[in-house]
């Protein structure tokens, strides 16, 4: 790896970093636990040369997002809000209705909320692929599996 060292600080060039693919199976796992593990990998915090202002993380594939689990009564009581930007345009959905309509949405919303706001966060979010079932179109990638708690 090509890097510039200045005393003890390591500056890694983003084009020298090899991005790997990580697969997380979300079946029967708690939503927040899976989301935090995915964000750690997307940001690159699992690597020794983590830099907060660069995209040094790996790509993440999450399968079985429709089988994700929640604790407590959140399945029927957790409310997701969105606004249409028109007067009186506040809309709300419970976890149940949102996951029936789009099974990957709750996990994507949780991960997007944990990423930095701004251009870097949008770039990191593009490195995430979430699938409702176990079938995915990225079979040609060499990925390593991660067991989330």
From Swiss-Prot:
Domain of life: Bacteria
Pfam name, any one: Ribosomal_L13
Similarity-based family: Belongs to the universal ribosomal protein uL13 family.
Keywords, alphabetical: Ribonucleoprotein, Ribosomal protein
Listed name of the protein: Large ribosomal subunit protein uL13
MF GO annotations: mRNA binding; structural constituent of ribosome
Quaternary state and interactors: Part of the 50S ribosomal subunit.
Gene source species: Borrelia turicatae (strain 91E135)
Record field: transmembrane: none
GO biological process, one term: negative regulation of translation
GO CC terms of this entry: cytosolic large ribosomal subunit
Task performed by this protein: This protein is one of the early assembly proteins of the 50S ribosomal subunit, although it is not seen to bind rRNA by itself. It is important during the early stages of 50S assembly.
């Amino acid at each position: 790896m090509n890097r510039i060292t200045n005393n003890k600080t390591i500056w890694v060039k983003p084009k020298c970093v090899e991005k790997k693919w990580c697969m997380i199976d979300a079946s029967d796992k708690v939503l927040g636990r899976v989301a935090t593990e995915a964000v750690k990998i997307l940001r690159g915090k699992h690597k020794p040369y983590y830099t907060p202002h660069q995209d040094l993380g790996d790509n993440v594939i999450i399968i079985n997002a429709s089988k994700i689990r929640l604790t407590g009564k959140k399945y029927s009581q957790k409310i997701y809000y969105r606004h249409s930007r028109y007067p009186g345009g506040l809309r709300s959905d419970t976890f149940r209705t949102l996951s029936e309509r789009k099974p990957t949405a709750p996990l994507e919303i949780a991960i997007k909320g944990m990423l930095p706001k701004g251009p870097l966060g949008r770039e990191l979010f593009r490195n995430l692929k979430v699938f409702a079932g176990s079938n995915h179109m990225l079979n040609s990638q060499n990925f390593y599996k991660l067991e989330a708690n």
